[in-house]
From Swiss-Prot:
The keyword Signal does not apply. It comes from Vaccinia virus (strain Copenhagen). This is Ankyrin repeat protein B18. InterPro entries: Ank_repeat_dom-contain_49 (IPR051637), Ankyrin_rpt (IPR002110), Ankyrin_rpt-contain_sf (IPR036770), F-box_dom (IPR001810), PRANC_domain (IPR018272). Residues 541-574 form the F-box domain. It comes from the Viruses. Pfam families: Ank, Ank_3, PRANC. Keywords: ANK repeat, Repeat.
Length: 574
């Protein structure tokens, strides 16, 4: 049911009576007009529809095109009563411009009718930005409105230049932005089918559009498409690649299309693989600098499958390895700095050195602390890499910075302190010594009260003393948890499993479980590899037969779990 008219014309007056200008303005600008109504019939017969308002320069046609209740049927009636479609408003807007950039649910027929009534060819400079503004309006204002393929075709056929630029953008720049934002969460845009998008882009190309035109920032349309965060429609991206966009063009920031995608804050693994494959298939080998930048920038970015992506990149780019540095940092440094735990895990598994320093002598732990943007995850990331750190000086440095560490999760902070007390046997004594110092107590006031902090340390220390009293064969549970040598820990595997279920340890139970699982899987894969290579070890023609089995086991234990797994289950080559 339509809304009641907010203004009703008096149609019972004599035809000789003059209709007031403000009445017409109100009627065409704000009323929900029925194309069959007697009011509309009365107006078009008794009023000069081409009369302009003094200030705005609007005619009846302009007013109606700005009406929120616009319909194609009413517009057709106005066009049939000889409205002037070439008159501009005071701001220079022509009716066809308003129609294409302001109105919803436009009929292709009325667009043709309006264009045909204008004797000027659309190549005239007054219409040069018409196609661009039509698509731009669908990108910026009328987000739920579709881009009509027939309208695009008509505008191009009528002579509009598809390469016209406004603020550096062409119509294709805006169209690619529309395609990217359709799939961005929260945008509420009308879906664009891949087939339709392909037809529209083909129309542009057929009419001479430059697919690699640059905006003021040096971006091609494909740059813009890939730079939109959460643009993750693999099928749309695959379709755009069929037009062979130029992958070598760098924008003003030195970024190629692939690097634009890598730095977009959201990476979909399958799209990343597709882009690199397309580049190497159609362009050739990627420059070493770009390969290095892709890997390092990827680590900084959120991705759907980080472990799969970093594995793919490291295998694909053979000259990028755990020792490669970029801006003075290794891959592992960057992974720690940006809290990418899955990448950290992978790089350590392939023998990345967690204790290596940057070119300006910073440890990975310091990079984590210095990155304030990731402060909510600082404790968790430090906690994650502590299992790999054996350098006592690094642990001591971490302990000294405890007052400045941001605390967002008490449980994580408690676990972090438990690690520090376990690995630094001077921590508790130094804490007790400084407990009464006002300066020391004040340093902890930023995130929690000193009493609460002191309580956590005391609780962890008490449980540490319990670890020292718990015997495991010829040593203590405390010594076992401090040990990082899987070969030595193997003999304590059964005892660790028993203590793992001991409810006396509330704080250190997680660390026990980590140690147990690490030793368990290491031992399992060493046994698998030994069994698999046994025919080699026992072959009389092999020099390895000269080595005692104990030495062979020692060598196998030097390998990472990842190395052992790959020997046990070699990756299949596609």
């Amino acid at each position: 049911m339509s809304r009641r008219l907010i203004y009703v014309l008096n149609i019972n007056r004599k035809s000789t009576h003059k209709i007031q200008e403000n009445e017409i303005y109100t009627y065409f600008s704000h009323c929900n007009i029925d194309h069959t109504s007697t009011e509309l019939d009365f107006v078009v017969k008794n009023y000069d529809l081409n009369r302009r308002q003094h200030v705005t320069g609007y005619t009846a046609l302009h007013c109606y095109l700005y009406n929120n209740y616009f319909t194609n049927d009413v517009l057709k009636i106005l066009l049939n009563h000889d409205v002037n479609v070439t008159m501009k408003t005071s701001s220079g807007r022509m009716p066809v411009y308003i129609l294409l950039t302001r109105c919803c649910n436009i009929s292709h027929d009325v667009v043709i009718d309006m264009i045909d009534k204008d004797k000027n060819h659309l190549s005239h400079r007054d219409y040069s930005n018409l196609l661009l503004e039509y698509i731009k309006s669908r990108y910026m204002l009328l987000k739920e409105e579709d881009i009509d393929e027939n309208i695009v075709s008509t505008l191009l056929d009528k002579g509009i230049d598809p390469n016209f630029k406004q603020d550096g953008y062409t119509a294709l720049h805006y169209y690619y932005l529309c395609l990217a934002h359709v799939y961005k969460p929260g945008e509420c845009r009308k879906p664009i089918t891949i087939k339709k998008a392909k037809r529209i882009i083909s129309l542009f190309i057929q009419h001479g559009a430059n697919l690699n035109a640059l905006d003021n920032c040096g971006n091609t349309p494909f740059h813009l498409y890939l730079s939109i965060e959460m643009c993750n429609n693999i099928h749309m991206t695959k379709m755009l690649l069929t037009f062979n966009p130029n992958f070598k063009i760098c924008n003003n920031h030195g970024l190629t299309p692939i690097l634009c995608y890598i730095t977009s804050d959201y990476i979909q693994h399958d799209i990343l693989v597709m882009l690199i494959h397309h580049y190497e298939t159609n362009v050739g080998e990627m420059p070493i600098d770009e390969r290095r930048m892709i890997v390092f920038e990827f680590i900084k970015t959120y991705s759907t499958r980080p472990a799969d992506s970093i594995t793919y990149l490291m295998n694909r780019f053979k000259n990028i390895n755990i020792y490669t540095r970029y801006e003075g940092k290794t891959l592992l440094h960057v992974a720690c700095e940006y809290n990418n735990t899955q990448v950290i895990d992978y790089l350590i598994r392939i023998n990345g050195d967690i204790n290596a320093l940057t070119d300006n002598n910073k440890h990975a732990t310091q990079l984590i602390i210095d990155n304030k943007e990731n402060s909510p995850y600082t404790i968790n990331c430090l906690l994650y890499i502590l299992r790999y750190i054996v350098d006592k000086n690094v642990i001591r440095s971490l302990v000294d910075q405890l007052p400045s560490l941001p605390i967002f999760d008490i449980k994580s902070f408690e676990k972090f302190i438990s690690y520090c007390i376990l690995l630094d046997d001077t921590f508790y004594d130094r804490h007790v010594k400084n407990r009464d110092s006002k300066t020391y107590r004040y340093a902890f006031s930023k995130y929690m009260s000193f009493d609460k902090y002191d309580g956590i340390i005391t609780k962890c220390h008490d449980e540490t003393m319990l670890l020292k009293l718990s015997t495991v064969l010829d040593t203590t549970l405390y010594a076992v948890l401090r040990c990082h040598n899987s070969r030595k820990l193997r003999r304590y595997l059964t005892e660790l499993k028993k203590y793992n279920n001991d409810k006396s340890f509330k704080i250190y139970s997680n660390i026990m479980n980590e140690r147990y699982l690490n030793v368990y899987y290491k031992d399992m894969y060493v046994s698998k590899v030994y069994d698999k290579l046994f025919p080699v070890f026992t072959d009389k023609n092999c020099l390895l037969t000269l080595l005692p089995s104990e030495i062979i086991y020692e060598i196998l234990y030097m390998l990472t779990i990842n190395d052992l797994y790959n020997i046990s289950y070699p990756p299949t080559k596609v």
